[in-house]
Amino acid sequence: MERAIQGSDVREQADSECWDGGGGGTTSPFKLPDESPSLHEWRLHHSEESENKDNPLGFKESWSFGKVVFKRYLRYDGAETSLHRALGSWERDSVNDAASRFLGLSQIGCTYSIRFRGTRLTLSGGSGTLQRLIEMAIRTKRTMLQPTPSEREGNVSRRRPEGTEAFKEESE
């Protein structure tokens, strides 16, 4: 079951609420279920012993229509298959379908927000500009999640070929 948040200050609630929810319901703009890590998994990932603590487990995103907010945490590891999956977490049609339930004759605010690696980007507009907002959200999400060339090279160079340690010992 989808969880929608209603209240006077949507942004405050979006920041303070847990990022959970069910699979994409008929109202939700999201097509994938929430994948928030458990508290135990989160602590293990960010412990001092973890080698991956600089790499996030995933990213947070939300769509809001007026005072109704839909949120998701999705796993993302930077791999190409993970990128395609993350980019498909919502589509133009699913956002339009969800928005149509809340948009009436009056102009209301629509917002898309994404947070990845400590950076949050929020796009806002009125219901009359929803199609433009969706286009901008698609480009923004792709840009934020797409690994840079240096990150791609860094992932390759971090993997140590077999025999490297033995070679270092012999050369010293």
Curated annotation (Swiss-Prot):
Homodimer. Residues 1-14, 150-172 have a biased composition (Basic and acidic residues). Residues 1-34, 145-172 are annotated as: Disordered. GO terms for biological process: symbiont-mediated suppression of host innate immune response. Keywords: Host-virus interaction, Inhibition of host innate immune response by virus, RNA-binding, Suppressor of RNA silencing, Viral immunoevasion. GO terms for cellular component: virion component. GO terms for molecular function: RNA binding. This is RNA silencing suppressor p19. InterPro entries: Tombusvirus_p19 (IPR004905), VP19_sf (IPR036131). Belongs to the tombusvirus protein p19 family. It holds the Pfam family Tombus_P19. It comes from Cymbidium ringspot virus (CymRSV). SUPFAM superfamilies: Tombusvirus P19 core protein, VP19 (SSF103145). Viral suppressor of RNA silencing which binds specifically to silencing RNAs (siRNAs). Acts as a molecular caliper to specifically select siRNAs based on the length of the duplex region of the RNA.
